[in-house]
């Protein structure tokens, strides 16, 4: 699975800042967890998270805007540093890999933490060996590879950027948690690549929400892919 169809630069700038910050510490003092009423039946299968940072109208980046749209605040940054999922395996496509490994090679502050994390790149265009440490290249069908990782692995997984990869994994019903941080800005004229373009219909069960710095909204859902509009009583996954 290659994510070369997206315009990656602005999205990657937001992505690298999020993951650099979230890899600094693994304190659990600010961890958000589902309440007992919302938790589903426990399973030994590792979970897959999709993480996105978006404007209100669903864009991950916009022409001329800084990372995080210049709206990050101390509460949000503290939550990133307390991220309990920093030891998860990171999944990405080829374009995201090229950008992120380039940031690391250039010594972008904090990217040394990413070098210590286990990473899997899905691509039919990259060739081994990959230069970024602890990175495994998987060619072929990404959905089937991730399905096998969930069935046989022990570590939770989360995506980094890679919009087309995320779309494929969600459509296949492999995503356990859909986590989005919404920033209070609409980038209708400058937004690049709407994150939800090409998605199927998805029912979302909210299990967590939080407001940071009085303006940034964290929303965490359990997704269910729908076979049709409400009332059809059919789901794909």
Regions found by a protein language model. Give the residues of each.
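Extreme N-terminal basic, low-complexity initiation segments
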Residues: 2-10
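Low-acidity, Ser/Thr- and Arg-rich intrinsically disordered low-complexity segments
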Residues: 4-5, 15-23, 27-29, 33
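Enzymes that bind and transform nitrogen-containing heteroaromatic metabolites
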Residues: 31-237
């Amino acid at each position: 699975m290659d994510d070369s169809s997206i315009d990656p630069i602005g999205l990657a700038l937001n992505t690298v800042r999020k993951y650099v910050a979230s890899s600094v510490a693994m304190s659990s003092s600010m961890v958000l967890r589902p309440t007992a009423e919302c938790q589903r039946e426990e399973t030994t299968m590792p979970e897959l998270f999709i993480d996105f940072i978006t404007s209100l109208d669903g864009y991950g980046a916009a022409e001329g805007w800084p990372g995080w749209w210049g709206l990050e605040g101390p509460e949000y940054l503290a939550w990133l540093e307390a991220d309990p999922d920093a030891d998860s395996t990171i999944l990405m496509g080829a374009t995201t890999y090229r950008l992120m490994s380039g940031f690391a090679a250039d010594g972008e502050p904090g990217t040394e933490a990413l070098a210590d994390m286990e990473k899997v790149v899905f691509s039919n265009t990259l060739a081994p060996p990959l230069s970024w440490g602890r990175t495994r290249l998987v060619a072929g069908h990404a959905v089937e590879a991730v399905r096998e990782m969930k069935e046989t692995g022990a570590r939770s997984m989360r995506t980094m950027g890679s919009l087309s990869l995320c779309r494929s994994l969600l459509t296949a019903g492999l995503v356990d948690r859909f986590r989005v941080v919404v920033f209070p800005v609409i980038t209708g004229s400058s937004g690049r690549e709407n994150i939800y373009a090409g998605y199927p219909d998805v029912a979302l069960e909210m299990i967590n929400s939080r407001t940071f710095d009085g303006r940034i909204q964290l929303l965490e859902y359990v997704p269910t892919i729908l076979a049709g509009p409400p009332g059809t009583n059919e789901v794909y996954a």
